[in-house]
């Protein structure tokens, strides 16, 4: 997960898309503290931050030598400030990755519309950003542009080449890649089928809107590894506005299920306010979101389970699987993607049998594939053994990828089996988790919407600490198996 910081003149004007004509004197975040921003990211589980170094209005948060429309012309630090330098230093000290957002659309620069001149201008500013501020791990290229604006041809592939030359480890995001792609909405909503495999030639960068489903779902027959990114703001707008309130912690948890839990990267925008700090109400929500994740996912209810597999590579085609074999089914209880269960080759049935050793109540399934070996599974389901010895399907899905989270009505059972129905190659599973989430409404996860919660963070944590049998936050039917 990454944090997005939308910050600039819009923070002081109440606008989302600035005109490019607002005077720089309005920019004066007197208490700006980049260390505070980075600390907030790190303690809440976000290992990367991205700053809007230049948004559509053209105002630069660093003292660019190619324009006067920057912090150099503002009263902040008497024109000597550099937001990106402050953020870079804080990120390096904390071990947090840094990314930059440089808007292609520029409403201030007069040469915008002149293809050759503006592309030269853009490359010059990109060079500044990629050579002054240490290691840059992410470059975010926004495809937004207002109607009626000047025609402009962007030299995307020239930009990509420059980025890879100056920052070889940087991931480049645009609507269609080349390294990560947009999921197609700003709700934090990933597709229920999501392949990290893609064919960018089928969706040119400017043509993603012609086939939004392809962009969201990816392509099992694709030739490139281009994972999907889900971006969403903690507030109604992308920039801070004093009249707006943040989403609730449960809202963010629902988004987590539908983004990270659907093989997507979550980029959550938390905009600094006009003083240069993250607002207290946003901090409270982030802390609540973190506590929710920890309380639900910190203990795998299957951690002490007995496991068997329909087959295990290197042990023949029969059911079983020892604890110490290289591809043991017990590998799915170890965190990390470099240990995994692998079935014998050329099998037509792939099943993991799970004995929890006692009756356990749960409503969340977590699965992971070792993606360094590619994304393989295209159909799976989980079954639980009924008390009259009848197997009953609990949930099912299509793709897994780096992580899949499925929520369903509460189940109580001891014996489970994970059945892989279809796979592009022999399926490999690196992790399997079973959890109890007592606060999220199952129907909101099943439906592709983000609901407004009536619980605040304090109430949520209180609910989680109660016995699950007394929790009244879910309207889902309980399946007693």
What are these regions (language model features)?
Residues 414-416:
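Exposed beta-strand face motif in extracellular beta-rich ectodomains
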Residues 191, 195, 199-200, 452, ...:
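Intrinsically disordered, low-complexity segments enriched in Ser/Pro/Gly/Ala and basic residues
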Residues 458-476:
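Extracellular mucin-like PTS segments
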Residues 283, 445-461, 478-481:
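Activation corresponds to long, low-complexity, non-globular regions
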Residues 1-348, 353-376, 384-386, 390-398, ...:
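Mature catalytic domains of secreted/periplasmic carbohydrate-active enzymes
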């Amino acid at each position: 997960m990454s944090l997005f910081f939308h910050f600039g003149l819009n923070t002081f004007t109440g606008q989302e898309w600035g005109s490019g004509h607002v005077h720089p004197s309005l920019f004066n975040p007197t208490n700006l503290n980049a260390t505070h921003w980075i600390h907030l990211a790190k303690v809440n589980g976000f290992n990367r931050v991205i700053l809007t170094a230049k948004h559509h209005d053209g105002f630069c948060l660093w003292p660019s030598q190619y324009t006067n429309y920057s912090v150099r012309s503002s009263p902040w630090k008497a024109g000597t400030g550099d937001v990106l330098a402050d953020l870079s230093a804080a990120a390096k000290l904390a071990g947090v990755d840094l990314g930059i957002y440089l808007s292609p659309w520029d409403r201030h620069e007069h040469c915008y519309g002149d293809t050759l001149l503006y592309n030269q201008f853009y490359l010059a500013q990109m060079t500044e950003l990629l050579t002054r501020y240490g290691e840059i791990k992410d470059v975010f290229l926004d495809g937004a542009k207002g109607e009626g604006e000047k025609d402009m041809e962007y030299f995307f592939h020239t930009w990509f080449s420059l980025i890879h030359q100056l920052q070889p480890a940087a991931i480049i995001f645009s609507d269609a890649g080349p390294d990560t792609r947009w999921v197609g909405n700003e709700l934090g909503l990933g597709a229920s089928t999501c392949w990290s495999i893609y064919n960018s030639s089928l969706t040119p960068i400017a043509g993603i809107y012609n086939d939004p489903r392809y962009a969201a779902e990816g392509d099992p027959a694709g030739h490139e590894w281009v994972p999907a990114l889900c971006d969403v703001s903690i507030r109604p707008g992308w920039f801070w506005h004093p009249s707006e309130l943040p989403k609730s912690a449960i809202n963010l948890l629902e988004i987590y299920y539908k983004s990270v839990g659907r093989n997507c990267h979550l980029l959550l925008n938390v905009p600094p306010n006009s003083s240069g700090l993250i607002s207290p109400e946003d901090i409270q929500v982030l802390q609540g979101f973190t506590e929710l994740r920890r309380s639900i996912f910190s203990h795998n209810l299957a951690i002490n389970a007995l496991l068997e597999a329909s087959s295990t590579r290197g042990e023949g085609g029969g059911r079983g699987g020892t604890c110490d074999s290289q591809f043991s089914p017990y590998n799915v209880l170890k965190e990390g993607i470099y240990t995994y269960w692998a079935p014998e080759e050329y099998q037509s049935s792939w099943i993991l049998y799970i004995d929890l050793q006692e009756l356990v109540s749960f409503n969340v399934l977590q699965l992971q594939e070792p993606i360094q070996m590619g994304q393989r599974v295209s159909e799976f389901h989980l079954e639980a053994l009924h008390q009259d010895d009848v197997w009953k399907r609990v949930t099912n899905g299509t793709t897994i990828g780096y992580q899949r989270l499925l929520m369903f009505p509460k189940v109580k059972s001891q014996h489970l089996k994970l059945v892989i129905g279809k796979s592009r190659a022999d399926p490999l599973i690196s992790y399997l988790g079973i959890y109890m989430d007592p606060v999220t409404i199952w129907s909101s996860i099943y439906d592709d919407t983000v609901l407004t919660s009536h619980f605040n963070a304090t109430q949520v944590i209180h609910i989680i600490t109660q016995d699950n049998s007394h929790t009244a936050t879910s309207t889902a039917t309980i399946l007693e198996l």
